[in-house]
UniProtKB/Swiss-Prot annotation:
Name of the coding gene: lpxA
Catalytic class of the enzyme: transferase
One of the GO biological process terms: lipid A biosynthetic process
Organism field: Leptothrix cholodnii (strain ATCC 51168 / LMG 8142 / SP-6) (Leptothrix discophora (strain SP-6))
Keywords: Acyltransferase, Cytoplasm, Lipid A biosynthesis, Lipid biosynthesis, Lipid metabolism, Repeat, Transferase
InterPro entries linked: Acetyltransf_C, Acetyltransf_C_sf, Hexapep, Hexapep_transf_CS, Lipid_A_LpxA, Trimer_LpxA-like_sf
Chief site of localization: cytoplasm
Name of the protein: Acyl-[acyl-carrier-protein]--UDP-N-acetylglucosamine O-acyltransferase
Length: 264
């Protein structure tokens, strides 16, 4: 049986696994489903059609599953889906989706989300990401796995952030950020490969070397984007590690799908 504080308000229709803990003065709505081992801190509000996986931790005063901040939203039923083992710190706000995409805001698993982070409608946040205090993701932003977004950063609607990318403190992100890169400054520019992050995740020296080659072609060799993409593509099939070809494919696929232009 779920452990619910006497002052919490949990709608009888909500579905809570037996080991869920709900803190003082929390409010849980009727369309909420919460998986085993998840802790809901004091004064949290979980509402809307929200599905939460197992072993998540929500700290006090978070607002999860509220209606999207989108003036075109006219009451259609949309959703928020959150994976497993996420940490969500104080005063975070996650909104449900809109019908402009598939109606679902999605959060992966194993994310570390610090205080005052905002995830707007239709955001797709991958897994193993770190979002520092006050990071703000506007509507339709997509973030790849293992990305890091610095504190007080603002990400413009529809921006895509690649896997393993790192955005520095107070980043003003209005264009797509390629995978594996560190970006910083105002205006935002690519500074280098995210070497520290890649090494922590076990990337071999060869894989890192290939990623550095891609960085050089894209950002240091004074090539047009079309020329750089062709040169990056020419790296395929020349590597001893098959995974390096996969890393090249990740970069090429990201560039091909970029709709707001690349940070360069």
């Amino acid at each position: 049986m779920a452990q619910i504080h006497p002052t919490a308000i949990v709608d009888p229709a909500a579905e809570l696994a037996d080991s869920v803990v709900v803190g003082a003065y929390a409010v849980i709505g009727p369309q909420v489903r919460i998986g085993a081992g998840t802790t809901i801190g004091p004064h949290c509000v979980i509402e809307g059609r929200t599905t939460i996986g197992v072993d998540n931790r929500f700290f006090q005063f978070s607002s999860i599953g509220a209606l999207p901040q989108d003036m075109s939203h006219d009451g259609e039923i949309t959703e928020l889906v959150i994976g497993d083992r996420n940490t969500v710190r104080e005063f975070c706000t996650f909104n449900t989706g809109t019908r402009k995409e598939d109606g679902v805001t999605r959060v992966g698993s194993d994310n570390w989300i610090m205080a005052y982070v905002h995830l707007a409608h239709d955001v797709r946040l991958g897994s193993h990401c770190v979002l520092a205090n006050n990071a703000t993701l506007a509507g339709h932003v997509h973030v790849g796995d293992w990305a890091t977004i610095g504190g007080l950063s603002g990400v413009h609607q529809f921006v895509h952030i690649g896997a393993h990318a790192m955005i520095g403190f107070q980043g003003h992100v209005s264009q797509d950020v390629p995978p594996y890169m560190t970006v910083d400054g105002n205006p935002l520019t690519v500074r280098a490969v995210n070497l520290t992050g890649l090494r922590r995740r076990g990337f071999s020296n060869e894989r890192i070397g290939v990623i550095r080659q891609m960085h050089k072609l894209l950002y240091r060799d004074s090539l047009t984007l079309e020329q750089a993409v062709e040169a990056v593509g020419a790296l395929r099939g020349q590597q001893a590690e098959a995974q390096s070809d996969a890393d090249i494919a990740v970069m090429l696929d990201f560039i091909a799908g970029a709709k707001r232009g690349l940070v360069r």
